[in-house]
């Protein structure tokens, strides 16, 4: 039996993907059956971190070592990730959501539709307010765009109004939100998005 939803979380290195996965797990684990697959190039660091902080029970977390280009393992040849997801779904037949966190990649990264149903793409303010207008599949076609670390805008000279304008122009009607995952600001918007995607919402 497959889970109700396979949700990809992608974005550049350091944007806050693992922080978002951790926050979603902590907030939803008491009302949904969750599992996580993480991707790292040569380690299982993100999986080990999520286990160490107790985001979920260890047996619900799988770490995939992709080697080479991280986008290949979520797009061109996603077999290693698909196997990890299917293993979790066999072990936990009542799963509601499997979160698949990609390795850190560039703005061109995207998930294979064979691997996930929907994708959240995470960027961060520290990379500069020009990022939304640079485009790329993550910016323009992800199901939800998360612009994280808004608390750093004043320190890096990023203009949130410019980011808002450019994001709206690039995405049209597709949803997006600002977050500061360290404080929890904006997390409710992400959780609302996820819950709205479930066939039978709790």
From Swiss-Prot:
The keyword Protein transport does not apply. Keywords: Chaperone, Cytoplasm, GTP-binding, Nickel insertion, Nucleotide-binding. Pfam families: cobW. InterPro entries: CobW/HypB/UreG_nucleotide-bd (IPR003495), P-loop_NTPase (IPR027417), UreG (IPR004400). Facilitates the functional incorporation of the urease nickel metallocenter. This process requires GTP hydrolysis, probably effectuated by UreG. Homodimer. UreD, UreF and UreG form a complex that acts as a GTP-hydrolysis-dependent molecular chaperone, activating the urease apoprotein by helping to assemble the nickel containing metallocenter of UreC. The UreE protein probably delivers the nickel. This is Urease accessory protein UreG. It comes from Prochlorococcus marinus (strain MIT 9313).
């Amino acid at each position: 039996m497959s889970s109700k939803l396979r949700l990809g979380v992608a974005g550049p290195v350091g944007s806050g993907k693992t922080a978002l996965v951790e926050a979603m797990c902590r907030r939803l684990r008491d009302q949904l059956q969750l599992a996580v697959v993480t991707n790292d190039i040569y380690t299982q660091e993100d999986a080990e971190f999520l286990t160490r902080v107790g985001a979920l029970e260890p047996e619900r977390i799988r770490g995939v070592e992709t080697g080479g280009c991280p986008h290949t393992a979520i797009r061109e040849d996603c077999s290693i990730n698909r196997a990890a997801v299917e293993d979790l779904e066999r072990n936990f037949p009542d799963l509601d959501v499997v979160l698949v966190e990609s390795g850190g990649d560039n703005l061109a990264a995207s998930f294979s539709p064979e691997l996930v149903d929907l994708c959240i793409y995470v960027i961060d303010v520290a990379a500069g307010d020009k990022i939304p207008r640079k485009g790329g599949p993550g910016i323009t076609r992800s199901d939800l765009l998360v612009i994280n670390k808004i608390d750093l805008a004043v320190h890096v000279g990023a203009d949130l109004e410019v980011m808002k304008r450019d994001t709206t122009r690039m995405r049209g009607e597709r949803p997006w939100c600002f977050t500061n995952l360290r404080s929890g600001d904006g997390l409710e918007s992400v959780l609302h998005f996820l819950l709205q995607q479930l066939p039978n919402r709790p």
